[in-house]
Amino acid sequence: MAGEYSGSRSSNTQLLAELEALSENLYQKPQVSVGNRRTNSLALPRSSVPSLVTSADEVSTARAEDLTVSKPRARRLSLSPWRSRPKLEVEEEENVTQSNRIVKKPEESSSGSGVKEEKKGIWNWKPIRGLVRIGMQKLSCLLSVEVVAAQNLPASMNGLRLGVCVRKKETKDGAVQTMPCRVSQGSADFEETLFIKCHVYYSPANGKGSPAKFEARPFLFYLFAVDAKELEFGRHVVDLSELIQESVEKMNYEGARVRQWDMNWGLSGKAKGGELALKLGFQIMEKDGGAGIYSKQGEFGMKPSSKPKNFANSFGRKQSKTSFSVPSPKMTSRSEAWTPASGVESVSDFHGMEHLNLDEPEEKPEEKPVQKNDKPEQRAEDDQEEPDFEVVDKGVEFDDDLETEKSDGTIGERSVEMKEQHVNVDDPRHIMRLTELDSIAKQIKALESMMKDESDGGDGETESQRLDEEEQTVTKEFLQLLEDEETEKLKFYQHKMDISELRSGESVDDESENYLSDLGKGIGCVVQTRDGGYLVSMNPFDTVVMRKDTPKLVMQISKQIVVLPEAGPATGFELFHRMAGSGEELESKISSLMAIDELMGKTGEQVAFEGIASAIIQGRNKERANTSAARTVAAVKTMANAMSSGRRERIMTGIWNVEENPLTSAEEVLAVSLQKLEEMVVEGLKIQADMVDDEAPFEVSAAKGQKNPLESTIPLEEWQKEHRTQQKLTVLATVQLRDPTRRYEAVGGTVVVAVQAEEEEEKGLKVGSLHIGGVKKDAAEKRRLTAAQWLVEHGMGKKGKKKSNIKKKEKEEEEEEMLWSLSSRVMADMWLKSIRNPDVKLH
């Protein structure tokens, strides 16, 4: 019996020892680098504090540890997922080196500092930031950075390639940079404009004494060496929210907004003594184009009489889409662009540099923030590992009295500043209505004064003010197009354009069937590209489609040029015959005069956004009342109406009608020919793919020694500015077909388009003929394959005649370059069938 008891006891002891060993393995400290580990739990520190020991105690303690059996570590209590670990010593040292700030090390910091670090980590977590922004409003902004040059660089940097990078401070995602520029004579001239789209969150004034507060939106700017990444020239931080505040304050105080900030930052390190010149600007990309920010003074809690950076309290009101407000008349004086007063120039002092040596150690430059931010920098790795959270449902409770006042009428802006007045405070509604009536009376007076100024010719309105209003209108119209898809009535077709009245006298909205798809979500069938050209949706099958469907094919049109009379008169075929005299340089000349932007990999929305943004920036720089942005929208509307007007009648009857009345603008010459051009470029695609039924009638040699039309050209925009007139007008452009279903891959080669028009008894222009042509060579196999692939995929491809195949086999060994062309004339206000012209040999 005693033996059984002793045996069971030994087995229990062995089992207990195994359990203790297993527990120790489970709860022992992981052997992983702490700096790279992330956990999702909040570790609660132990309250026990280790006691101080003497040297004598250490010996006894060491002996006791040798005799004591190691016990398993007690398990930590955790609250998932709320955990934020304090920064490590390595990260603290990096921050000290980069920003030259004195930071305590973890072992030197007290328990209160540890709690502070823990709190910062929690508030920088994306779900928490999403909850904090529930009561805030969001502004969509476009930051424009015009990189001018890096000047006064040391002579030792000549030949070094430099670039400028701009990115959000908290993350490296979405960073943009300039093209490399080589330093020459101590200067690197970039002359490039960068764009970054972002959101700025702010809390509007609540009418209780608290002004509007913006959330910091810092951006990081720095110069870098392309061929020497280890070089550092200094980094600078600009807060976009501060720029918005300054612009709003100056607008409310002086009546003129800040259009541009000139920045000149001193460089450090190897480029000490040099400076980086930039021009910063921003555009509010909201429905109202930013007009509401500068007109609704109560929204930001500011009054026109308040000084800059001194927000006065007021009661903001929100307007419905049907309401309106008349801003106070703007001041006629406008100051020039100004620079923030402080925080820009470098304050670091570095030793001089005589020569550029990449081997010597360089000093770490400090970041020079323009505005001092209280919030810590958010780390890019945190944004990558944490998922994005958005608040999908939120609401704000309103007081019943406020709802009653809002239903009675729009609440006007009131100052909360208390003054001694003998009023009856027992009836706040009565006081509110009196204030409201006073505000409405002021608005009516301002409206009458504006109408009177317009009747007098608008002498009091300056050119810069007209630029502001046109820019706001352009942005508002463009952004409304992006959000009105559910109505399925595009704004392009709702405007009454002269061209639609001249063509068919019938609005596009009257047509019950749609034959053109949109290029993107609610942006229409025509958009302008960044280089000033156009991207046009096509429907070569003439079938009914939905606007939300993806087009099967689009054509990208370059900027138009005009052939001057010095080139001599020439018909369509004669025009291409003389062009062929350039020989092998023909394609390079065409691409230099009528270049097109590369759209591979972009979306329709991105192309449209880049086009309107480029037009707005160009209009700002030129400071013209008739801005390029306004002309962009007008030209897009014209081409959209031309592509849609009369299409249904043409499909039903098969008759190609042309504009009956003379055209008033040279821009309409190409627009009225778009539908015929759509058919002819598809025929040209078949020629490139060797899938055409009819061969060229014969081949001719290029015209040598005659005037080349490409050498006597001028851009259409300059031709209009100089108010030139020609009896016979020839407009040239290039067209590249692209497949939207293949990320806008190029289909076939580039085609040259020539539209000829004549002046009709000083009444206007009349289109007479349309011609297209392109270079076909055996070496360009990719063009032929992409053209054939699209035609076969959509059932429009078929083999050509056997004669063409035999002819091709006979000339297999020869490298031929031919210029093919198609022509179509107008007779009795109708387009005739296009015919194939003789091919022209380029050699």
Curated annotation (Swiss-Prot):
Residues 365-381 have a biased composition (Basic and acidic residues). Its main location: cytoplasm. Residues 30-65, 88-116, 300-412, 450-472 are annotated as: Disordered. Residues 456-472 have a biased composition (Acidic residues). Pfam families: NT-C2 (PF10358), PMI1_PMIR1-2_C (PF21745). Residues 131-284 form the C2 NT-type domain. This is Protein PLASTID MOVEMENT IMPAIRED 1. It comes from Arabidopsis thaliana.
